[in-house]
Amino acid sequence: LIGMTRVWALELGPHGITANAIGPGPIRTELFDRANPPDAPRTRAIIDAVPVRRIGTPDDVAHAASYLLDARSGFVTGQVLYVCGGMTVGVAGV
């Protein structure tokens, strides 16, 4: 997906079209909560592995998408916007 995003950015840029991707980290969704109950040791381990010490929310991802959809971000293309609480900065322990 990242490779396709970069290719699309190069191919579509001359037409005024930007192409970007969002790279989410652990996001608190119904599926996440079913697999990782709030009081489970694994959930605590996931939170401890995130530098900001919390699980992301759908709103965190939506905010990133909103930024990329805004006309003022028209000079941003071919990028991955990681919404991961800093997990991609280093090696996660999970």
For each feature predicted by the language model, list its residue ranges:
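Rossmann-like NAD(H)/NADP(H) cofactor-binding core
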Residues: 15, 20, 79
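A conserved structural motif in NAD(P)-dependent oxidoreductases
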Residues: 50-61, 72
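Short, flexible catalytic-loop segment of classical short-chain dehydrogenase/reductase
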Residues: 23-34, 83, 89
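Short-chain dehydrogenase/reductase
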Residues: 5-6, 62-65, 69
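Short C-terminal tail/terminal secondary-structure segment
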Residues: 66, 77-94
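Conserved catalytic helix of short-chain dehydrogenase/reductases
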Residues: 1-11
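Alpha-helical segment proximal to the catalytic Tyr-Lys
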Residues: 10-14, 74
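A short C-terminal helix-loop "cap" of Rossmann-like NAD(P)-dependent dehydrogenase/epimerase domains
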Residues: 34-50
